[in-house]
Amino acid sequence: MLNFFFFVSISLIFFLPALRYLKQQHYKRAGTFALLGLASLAGIHIWSDVYLTSLWYDNLGYASRYWKVLFLRAELFLAGGVVAISLGLTNIFFWYRSAKPAGPSPIRDNRSKLILLVGLALQIPLFIASGTISSAHWNEALLFFNAVPFGKEDPVFLKDIGFYIFSLPFLNFIVDSLSSLFTFSLLLVAGLYVAESVFFRVLPGLAFDNFTRTPFAHRLVTQISANFVFGTSVFIARTFIARYELLYSHRGVVYGAGWTDLHAQLPAYNVALVALAGCLLLFLYASFTSSTRRTIGIYLASAALLGGIWIVGLQIIPEIIQHFRVSPNELPLESPYLERNIKFTKEAYGLTNVAEIEFPVNPSPSGVLAQSDLTIINGIRLWAPDILKAVNDQTQFIRLYYNFPDVDVDRYMLNGKLTQLMLSLRELNISRLAAQSRTFQNETMIYTHGYGDVAAPVNKFTHEGLPEYYIKDIPPIASYPELRIDQPRIYFGEETFNHVYVNTKLKEFDYPKGDTNAQNTYSGKAGVQIDSFVKKLAIAMRFDGLRLFTTQELTPESRILFTRDINQRVRTIAPFLTFDKDMYHVIAEGKIYFMWDAYTTATTYPYSQPTMGKANYIRNSVKVVVDAYEGTVDFYVSDKADPVIRAYAGAFPSLFKPFDAMPKSLKNHVRYPEDLLAIQSHIYAIYHMGDPGVFYNREDAWEISRVAIRQEEAQPILPYYLISKLPDSDREEFVLTLPFSPYSTDKNSPRNNMVAMIMARCDGDKYGKLMLFKFPKDRQVYGPLQIGIRINQDETISKDLTLWNQQGSQVRFGNLLAVPLSGYRLMYIQPIYIQASVGKMPELRRVVVVFGDQLSYGASFEEALSKFFPQIGGSASENRAKPAETKEEKKAERKDLVATAAKAFENYRNLMGKGKYEEAGKALEELGRILNQMK
């Protein structure tokens, strides 16, 4: 409402003169000032948006990136608008001059001027629409003008791949725009002459022969001929470009130009080009001939010629050849083109150097575990992200207004040991504040940031089946110096959506501290400083209106932080990049950072099979790092060989940094992206078949293995991280993996055995390298879905599950993981949790371990594993929490919890007494959490 009053108050400044003239019945002046007022308001809105956005970019150090795109969009807007109205004005003035009578005719003159004014008025929306559409294609223009070569040529036209990635999309946009303008031009000409016919009664009673002899008809066909010259030129360009688009043909079994495309479709396009060139000359001739009938004859002949070529040459003949010549001889004719499809698809998805290793699975768990196996086993993830989040929500929430957006998986070197951790940030969610606390000051000046982190090892838990935390509570307590957090405040996060003002006269809420709250003042440099009236006006226009001028809490040192959620913040700066679905945060040198994988993609890589909707080229070329306190955004180029990112770096030299400039503490946390491996695996499941004959018959086609998620529902496994030791390595490393099963056309009866596993390496110099474990084809290797079925059908496990469900608890299954070990052994692990129907806090109750045909089941991972390897029992204590507190410490902690619970209960009673039932319900939820901690 205050924003509305602010808008009205500014509007009055501009509209008061108009109101004064309106009162004096000076309507023309009143209208003039009203238009000036509207233009001024629009100008102020545009100015405030551009000015405030430029200040935001300047604070991040990317002002040059903002201005470059803004000016490029303005240039495209003007270019598109000018071209559009140039064509329109040419047609209008040609008509107006030819329609003027030879002698004086005031009535005809006035009507012609009326038509002229209407036509001219239409040019304004045409200019705006054409300019807006053109400016929206700034990314294609940017790449076109900053193109770099790929150093590879397509096999048909021998053009560098860069032409298809950088030039072809922009050329397509230009040709499509001109085609639309040609259509509009014809409609405009038709409208002008129809209006003339209606106003001046040109046509009534005229037979066709008589009509063709009139000056009106001659002017009409002459102007249409001139437009056809323009349109035919555009169609020549369109047909010429269509030749290159054969490299994305879907005809037949090949994606890309196949036998029919190159032996029938391409020659037909060449014939069409010759025919269009002939028609262009005919239309040029028709523009100057004095015979209307001859011109109409040219139209009909050209239409028949082009229609015949289009229908017969471009549609019917290629389909006949495909059906009768190619389909009966498909494999021998299409094999060379299948080879191209395989080769270029692998190149486009970065799959040319996958190291394939035979892994003759040993179904027996017998033998001694190597030291590397023990390291792998001690790092296997038992906590599922969604289940750990549910536990965190119960044990580490602290207050209702905190929120854990998700759980991230990463590795840390703790005491010299590579350890896989699961981490959750405690962000602030103002929507969870009590209704009476949702005030302007609370939402924008006091509750400004989240606080701290929660971290737990992936496989350690207490005797109660809860996680053993390495970082917990507020302020955060870290069990290892490598996990210390010197700056735990989170001003920029995954779910930090609102704007805030910092460095105000009010102290910010920091974290709850006993009966009071700790307070804080922001000391960073993020945001826009509110040190002038002009800045305050621009901020008020976008955000808080009059409140910004009436509040007494702002000082010249105050700052506004906006666009604080990482997703929008990063995408605003680099909208031309594609981003992974999952960003993750890391702790490095005592600070919290977000890391986000960004991709360069394209849809026009020749002969490459599309996926991800339309894209058929992808590179993980950029690692984005965002400081959770300062809000800084850094773009590190992780694949400098990618021509697409080199083009963007050429356009924005100050935006991208070399990967070597990334601090080592952050490099240690770079991961291979989950989305990228999922996409590559989807492609490699088919394109690992390099032989055209095998590929054609799909003899060895795979798909990503599936796992049961409900009673009769299965879905593909998502990539998961492991600590593993690969054959060519002398140490354990962090890898991302995904299993494959044979492809099945019948989804109701899939082939569920496992045929391979792909590993993506995440560490050091081996980052990004892919390794494939190929399993034997001559014997059964159980897949995840089969293992899941066996677990559910095991008699002992089934009885326990039934008993737990009957006791009112809900059984939840964790992620089913396949883990390769030494001696070509393949181990499956699945944890089982139970949670009460009230409280929703899962606890680990059983772990299932499977080797081949043998299944083991225990109350802990070690217990289940020790049935295969008795020596593992000695290390069971490693994954059980050791008592970390003395009895006195536990007693003191329990005393604090009792006091806190009593206070929460008293708060609940007070709220109930006041009739504030919603707030009382929230107070009761908080009491429940405290009581859960006391268990």
Residue spans of the language-model regions?
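Hydrophobic transmembrane alpha-helical segments in integral membrane proteins
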Residues: 1-14
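N-terminal membrane topogenic signal
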Residues: 1-4, 26-30
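Soluble extracytoplasmic regions of secretory-pathway and membrane proteins
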Residues: 15, 20-21, 39-914, 918-934
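Cytoplasmic-side transmembrane-helix entry/capping segments in multi-pass membrane proteins
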Residues: 28-35, 301
